[in-house]
Swiss-Prot record:
Signal peptide: none annotated. Keywords: Cytoplasm, Elongation factor, Protein biosynthesis. Involved in peptide bond synthesis. Stimulates efficient translation and peptide-bond synthesis on native or reconstituted 70S ribosomes in vitro. Probably functions indirectly by altering the affinity of the ribosome for aminoacyl-tRNA, thus increasing their reactivity as acceptors for peptidyl transferase. GO terms for molecular function: translation elongation factor activity. This is Elongation factor P. GO terms for biological process: peptide biosynthetic process. Pfam families: EFP, EFP_N, Elong-fact-P_C. NCBIfam families: efp (TIGR00038), PRK00529.1 (NF001810). Belongs to the elongation factor P family. The lineage of its organism: Bacteria, Pseudomonadati, Spirochaetota, Spirochaetia, Spirochaetales. Pathway: Protein biosynthesis; polypeptide chain elongation. It is found in: Cytoplasm. HAMAP family: EF_P.
Length: 192
């Protein structure tokens, strides 16, 4: 997109920093008496998800980049790839599990025929976004012990994608539950 001065950087901007795409998480502008202005940034690398803090002088320039979010339908998974379909062109494409960082944490949340947001930079998928909560069907649940409710009793339940989470004792096989996609914890039962 072009270069911008450090004073023009906003929270949420996408920058090419040290050859890697980053998003600005925090920005703090300071004007030092005769020393000039400085900008403190907290940046998240979009490829490896590391977070770094950087300080730039007011006259420094950085390259702003364009990152696209594309809605695509998840079709299926083979041994090394997730297969998606572009909703505009109906073309199918692969996302290699080894090429997208931290994707293994998200794979068990993907459900066939659901639409997900893929983050692309330089025509390459660098992230897959999940909704905050995802609905699953319970396919296996440990038996609840009657009277075991002195504390907030939880049991392991297995969901139809293979994900195992802790859920309250009243959750049974066949129930649908919402799971927080960030914490991988039970959120609530889906009301039908």
């Amino acid at each position: 997109m072009g270069t911008i001065k450090s004073g023009e950087i906003e929270k949420g901007s996408f920058l090419l920093f040290k050859g890697m795409p980053h998003i600005v998480l925090e920005r703090e502008f300071s004007k030092m008496g005769r020393g000039g202005a400085i900008v403190r940034l907290k940046l998240k690398n979009l490829k490896n998800k590391s977070v770094v803090k950087e300080t730039l002088k007011g006259a420094d320039t950085v390259e702003e980049i364009e990152v696209l979010e594309v809605s695509s339908q998840y079709l299926y998974r083979d041994s090394e790839n997730l297969i998606f379909m572009d909703l505009e062109t109906y073309d199918q494409f692969n996302v290699n599990l080894r090429e997208v960082p931290n994707i293994e944490d998200k794979v068990l949340f993907f459900q066939e025929a659901e639409v997900y947001s893929l983050v692309k930079w330089d025509n390459e998928v660098i992230d897959l976004k999940l909704p905050p909560k995802v609905a699953f069907e319970v396919v296996a649940a440990e038996a609840a012990v009657k009277g075991d409710t002195v504390t907030n009793a939880m049991k392991n339940v297995t969901l139809h994608t293979g994900l195992v989470v802790k859920a309250p004792l009243f959750i049974n096989v066949g129930d649908k539950i919402l799971v927080n996609s960030e914490t991988k914890e039970y959120a609530e039962r889906v009301k039908e």
